[in-house]
Amino acid sequence: NIPVLANERTALELNLDPMLTKYFGSLDLVRVGDDLSILTVPVPHGDSDNVAFVANYRGERAAVITDLGSWTDELVKHVHGCQHISIEANYDEKLLDHGPYPYSLKERIRGRGGHLSNKQTGEFLAEVCTENTRTVVLTHLSEKNNSPHLAESTILYHIGDFFSGDIDISLQDGPEK
């Protein structure tokens, strides 16, 4: 009996109880109490209605971004300057190229509606990180086509000259510092 925030398509696919579901649309600002607001920003991923979340709690802004193969100007606009950013760094391009997946799956992963490579994540972070950004958490790392070291070193290549905050890595079986 816990209320859930979801867009209509996700709620239907997960068979969520409509009485316990608060629905949102793209670019809706959802208020939770007096101090917390959450903006839903659409991101391209397959044929789903995925969104990123940009939360604001008493002036601290945090973004949670996963399952996207590319980004939009709209996403950059809303994530720019967030203090905390959690974002996927799904694969290393060379490991994916030489990995065990069939060509069709590799192309889907690489596509506009697939997932971000370490390089793409670094490029995105170079656009949105500012002196206000204190924490970056890399998520959704592929176990077959990535490694924490490759992800972090690629991100640092793109933002290391100006980013002085913390980079953490969230592995599938728990966090890694």
PLM region descriptions:
Residues N1, R58-E60, E131-V137:
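Short, surface-exposed connector motifs at secondary-structure boundaries
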Residues N7-A11, I167-E176:
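A short, structured active-site edge motif that brings together acidic residues
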Residues T21-K22, I38, I167-I169:
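Generic structural signal for residues in well-ordered beta-strands
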Residues T10-L16, N145-N146, E176-K177:
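Short, charged/polar "capping" segments at the starts of alpha-helices
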Residues G25-H84:
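Core dinuclear metal-dependent hydrolase active-site scaffold
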Residues N1-L29:
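Active-site HxH/HxHxD metal-binding segment of metal-dependent hydrolases
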